[in-house]
């Protein structure tokens, strides 16, 4: 089921998606909403939407449901890092904010955030860099209110590339895709 709730009211509207996953809700003008999606065996998901300042009340919101399975690795889209850096980029913050919502909607879940580097550089340096990246992601989630007891960070260096190119022949895009963060469910 999927539900919508206006931010300023306690009224909850629930709907079931059709066979294609489509859903519809009547929306009030100039109102903030929180949509919540639940499916057995999957992470609960939510999104915030608003009709404020919109000439049309038709709002399209897609949800990507992840299976809630212990030890399952989920790649976070667009959590990439600049070369030799571990700071959270603005594009990565947007994706980590989605993970914050997911963790808020699933308060019993604990995860490991794992970070990876590309193949350039020495193994020990890359391991240290990936550990800093994973810790940066965890620190970001903690700064948004997720308790540190639910989070673990782990760096894998260049040991688990997502791209199978030979290092010297990898394109810049392939190197970028290897510099990533994923999460694994530790408990549900």
Predicted regions and their residues:
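Short, ordered, surface-exposed loop/turn motifs in non-cytosolic proteins
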Residues: 1-10, 91
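Conserved "repeat-terminator" motif of extracellular CCP/Sushi domains
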Residues: 59-73
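Structured interaction patches on ligand/partner-binding surfaces of diverse proteins
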Residues: 40-61
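Exposed aromatic-hydrophobic patches
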Residues: 22-27, 61-62
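Periplasmic OmpA-like peptidoglycan-binding domain that tethers envelope proteins to the cell wall
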Residues: 114-188
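Short, acidic Ser/Thr/Gly-rich low-complexity loop/linker segments typical of extracellular
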Residues: 6-22
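A short, solvent-exposed beta-strand micro-motif common in secreted/extracellular proteins
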Residues: 21, 29-41
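Periplasmic peptidoglycan-binding/anchoring modules of Gram-negative envelope and division proteins
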Residues: 81-115, 138-143, 183-188
